[in-house]
Amino acid sequence: MGRAKKVVLAYSGGVDTSVCIPYLKHEWGVEEVITFAADLGQGDELDPIRLKALDAGASQSLVGDLIEPFVEQFALPAIRANALYEGRYPLSTALARPLIARQLVEVAREVGADAVAHGCTGKGNDQVRFDLAIAALAPDLKVLTPAREWSMSREEAIAYGERCGIPAPVSKKSPYSIDLNLLGRSIEAGPLEDLMVAPPEEVFAMTSSIDAAPSQAQDIEISFEAGNPVAIDGVRLDSVGLIKEANRLAGRHGFGRLDIIENRVVGIKSREIYETPGLLLLIRAHQELESLTLAADVLRMKRQLEMQWAELVYQGLWFSPLKDALDGFMDRTQTYVNGLVRIRLQKGNAMVIGRSSDTNSLYISEMATYGSEDNFDHRAAEGFIYIWGLPSRLWAAARRG
């Protein structure tokens, strides 16, 4: 008896998910495999991917346009939360997984499947993200994970696929594993596993090299309403269009490349190469506007909770109660994050050079100036410092005694 009768497989067209189709049927006795591929703005033509799944043995090959919900329901909350895992990675890949899992469950319900499946390996983060999201949304559905159990190396998986008539999507000349969506690209494997090998220019697609980037700086203005980016240089754009334009501008100037060592959920360290020009640009601008519009104690607390928020998303806990509670805090603070930020793009840099908020700025020039317009009560500082330093004086006196 097979492990399931009808399975919906999260499908990308890559090695692992392609090999999963014949493997589920031939090795695990699954009667019917239906694939689902998500359009997340990766720019690929998805019809060849759909046909590839059918050629590999899928009974149905479904494609869903998830670009708008990806941006509205996942990217924008990440921008409002200034989400940077370990202070650097803006979660461009991690944000896509709960959305794909949610859609996978919906498709499974629609077609009457008794299981879902994915092609994640046993040492990556995505297996955790898919499994936890599916468990939170549909604990009754079985989750099949052939790539976690088959013990095949990448080369062996490619060979298995070729025996089943599946052409290999990579070659010895291009050994990299690449994941991409509207928010960015992640590149790993191959020569990049040597930590001292610089990523070759050929692995990048969204960003110019420093040499190729324009020498002339470009100043842009990003406008925000309630924490959401809504316009660039005064031109209002829908959320998807704004991300695309941010990608174009930042990428043209070579901003948005990351080469980092990352702590995976499963406990190992890995080298990750990312291109996330637009997302990093928008987070930087958003952070700056918050520094102008949020009270100091709110800002300090938010910075702490941002790290927690990013860790939850990275670790696959998008649908957790704690993540939901943190969303409430983030959303409440964004009421005041209205205004614009001016950024100078040049040769891989994005430097904030201006910020303003007509309605919510907490910067009072008469308080901050050292000029003749200064109306800060300097005499009040002496009493404040005395009270503020009282615990230190009492502690010092007790030690002397």
Curated annotation (Swiss-Prot):
This enzyme's EC code(s): 6.3.4.5
Pathway entry: Amino-acid biosynthesis; L-arginine biosynthesis; L-arginine from L-ornithine and carbamoyl phosphate: step 2/3
GO biological process terms on file: argininosuccinate metabolic process; L-arginine biosynthetic process; urea cycle
Residues noted as binding L-citrulline in the record, renumbered to the chain: 89, 125, 129, 177, 186, 262, 274
Subcellular location: Cytoplasm
Protein name: Argininosuccinate synthase
Keywords assigned by UniProt, alphabetized: Amino-acid biosynthesis, Arginine biosynthesis, ATP-binding, Cytoplasm, Ligase, Nucleotide-binding
Pfam families the record matches: Arginosuc_syn_C (PF20979), Arginosuc_synth (PF00764)
Extent of the signal sequence: none
PROSITE patterns from the UniProt entry: ARGININOSUCCIN_SYN_1, ARGININOSUCCIN_SYN_2
Family: Belongs to the argininosuccinate synthase family. Type 1 subfamily.
A GO CC term assigned to this protein in UniProt: cytoplasm
Catalytic activity: L-citrulline + L-aspartate + ATP = 2-(N(omega)-L-arginino)succinate + AMP + diphosphate + H(+)
Top-tier EC class: ligase
Binding site for ATP: 10-18, 38, 119
Listed InterPro entries: Arginosuc_syn_C, Arginosuc_syn_N, Arginosuc_synth, Arginosuc_synth_CS, Arginosuc_synth_type_1_subfam, AS_cat/multimer_dom_body, Rossmann-like_a/b/a_fold
Stored NCBIfam families: argG, PRK00509.1
Gene3D superfamilies recorded: Argininosuccinate synthetase, chain A, domain 2, HUPs, Single helix bin
A Gene Ontology molecular function term of the record: argininosuccinate synthase activity
Binding site for L-aspartate: 121, 125-126
Assembly, per entry: Homotetramer.
